[in-house]
């Protein structure tokens, strides 16, 4: 299976999960799970939300940010991977001057 994010439609989500600013995403949903390309512009964030049914795996490719998962703060930068396990609450904040870009995999279990 190949997912080509260049072929997917972009959606803009204002104040995602109560966060600041906007989030820009491209998503593919299939039998394996959800696969998402996400861009969080400077001064924007994804607000705190519960991972009710699956883990949330985020591979950072560009920019700087912070993930807060169950009150634990993690520094995000290119080459890092933030995992929020099922049952945990997390948020992602762009703390840099450039876009924070990452790919998320939410496996279907």
Positions of PLM-derived features:
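Histidine-centered metal-chelating micro-motifs
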Residues: 45-47, 66, 82, 86-92
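A short, N-terminal "cap"/entry segment at the start of jelly-roll beta-barrel domains
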Residues: 1-34, 47
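Conserved short histidine dyad/triad with adjacent acidic residue
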Residues: 36-51
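Ligand-binding loop in jelly-roll beta-barrel domains
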Residues: 86-109
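Short acidic-glycine-tyrosine-enriched beta hairpin
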Residues: 72-86
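Glycine- and acidic-residue-biased ligand/ion/polar-headgroup-sensing regions
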Residues: 53-65
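Short strand-connecting beta-turns/loops that link adjacent beta-strands
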Residues: 31, 53, 97-98
């Amino acid at each position: 299976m190949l997912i080509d994010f260049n072929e997917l439609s972009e959606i803009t989500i204002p104040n995602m999960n109560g966060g600041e600013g906007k989030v820009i995403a491209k998503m593919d949903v299939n039998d394996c799970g959800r696969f998402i390309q996400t861009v969080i512009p400077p001064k924007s964030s994804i607000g705190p939300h519960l991972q009710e049914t699956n883990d949330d795996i985020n591979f950072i490719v560009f920019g700087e940010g912070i993930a807060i998962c169950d009150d634990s703060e993690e520094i995000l930068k290119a080459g890092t991977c933030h995992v929020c396990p099922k049952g945990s609450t997390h948020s992602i904040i762009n703390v840099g001057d450039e876009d924070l870009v990452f790919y998320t995999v939410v496996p279907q279990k």
